[in-house]
Amino acid sequence: MTSDELVERLIDFAARVGKVVDALPDTRMGRHIGGQLVRSGTSPAPNYEEACAAESRADFVHKLSICLKELRESRSWIRLIIKTEMLPEHRMGELLDECNQLCNIIARSIVTAKKRKEKTDKH
């Protein structure tokens, strides 16, 4: 997958998060979870774009780590929406699956970048 394709997936994820947040009930819990999810679910795309423009490999890894952290937080909020039955699981399942896939992709990218850094540090 190219970085442009990953950016598109992250932007699509953010757009889907926005739609989910807008569909949450207007309750104290719905507003709280919605606020948290909109922040964590929309930040991975710009954080990944920043990583692509990193000034060093260490900066790249750091920015990817922030992206992964936000995706993992989003995953927790999505799971809570499912557990509390705020929205039907069939509606949330695809979003949760995409979040898991994005977490795996970013985590693998971090591992690869760290290995490359170790190789360059040894030479």
Segments (PLM) and residue ranges:
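Short, C-terminally biased terminal segments at protein or domain edges
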Residues: 1-123
